[in-house]
């Protein structure tokens, strides 16, 4: 029963995640990328304020610093994602955003000197093929939206990497 609920939960999260790209694409018809970002972060701030109100008084200086750094990485990822979506398709935007997962081990290798394993290399090579198939045009150039979206993936990859580092240093 727990496994079935877990699978259902993953399917629901996947639908919501994928639907977000289409919803953002539709929103871009009426709003600028930074208007979308403003609404997104305003709603998130209000919800976090409601749910974390009791914990706000106990936040340490380190948590504020780490949270700010993570916020910059996260904001960069979202901003570049929305800007990229303005110039590419929702499907390209979603796939290229998801390449952040294979970027994290390389960031860990470059910054933290963490050794790469075979799965990291094979996964990255496979993702690179997917990026090429989706993004390369007939003259082997890559579209503006796809470039923005790849940088968005880097922002999210840094956020994931730094969350792992900072999470070990605070409560």
Residue ranges and their predicted role:
Residues 39-40, 70, 96-99, 119-122, ...:
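Hydrophobic core positions of alpha-helical segments in small-molecule transporters
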Residues 27, 36, 40, 84, ...:
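Hydrophobic/aromatic residues within transmembrane alpha-helices
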Residues 1-35, 140-165:
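Glycine-/small-residue-enriched transmembrane alpha-helix faces in small-molecule transporters
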Residues 48, 68-70, 116-136, 152-156:
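Hydrophobic transmembrane alpha-helices of multi-pass small-molecule transport proteins
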Residues 18, 38, 42-46, 128-129, ...:
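Small-residue-rich packing faces within the transmembrane alpha-helices of Major Facilitator Superfamily
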Residues 47-56, 100-122:
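C-terminal transmembrane-helix exit sites in multi-pass transporters
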Residues 14, 48-52, 78-81, 108, ...:
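Structural signal for membrane-spanning alpha-helices in multi-pass inner-membrane proteins
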Residues 20-21, 49-97, 133:
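Specific transmembrane alpha-helical segments of multi-pass solute transporters/efflux pumps
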């Amino acid at each position: 029963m727990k496994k079935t609920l877990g699978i259902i939960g993953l399917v629901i999260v996947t639908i919501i995640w994928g639907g977000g790209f289409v919803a953002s694409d539709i929103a871009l018809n009426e709003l600028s990328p930074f208007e979308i970002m403003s609404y997104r972060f305003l709603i998130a701030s209000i919800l976090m304020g409601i749910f974390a109100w009791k914990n706000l008084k106990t936040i340490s200086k380190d948590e504020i610093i780490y949270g700010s750094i993570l916020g910059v990485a996260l904001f960069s990822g979202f901003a570049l994602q929305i800007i990229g979506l303005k110039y590419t398709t929702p499907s390209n935007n979603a796939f290229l955003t998801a390449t952040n997962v294979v970027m994290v081990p390389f960031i860990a290798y470059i910054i933290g000197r963490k050794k790469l394993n075979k799965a990291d290399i094979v996964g990255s090579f496979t993702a690179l093929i997917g990026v090429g198939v989706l993004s390369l045009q007939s003259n082997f150039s890559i579209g503006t939206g796809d470039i923005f979206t790849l940088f968005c993936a880097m922002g999210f990859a840094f956020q994931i990497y730094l969350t792992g580092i900072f999470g070990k240093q605070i409560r």
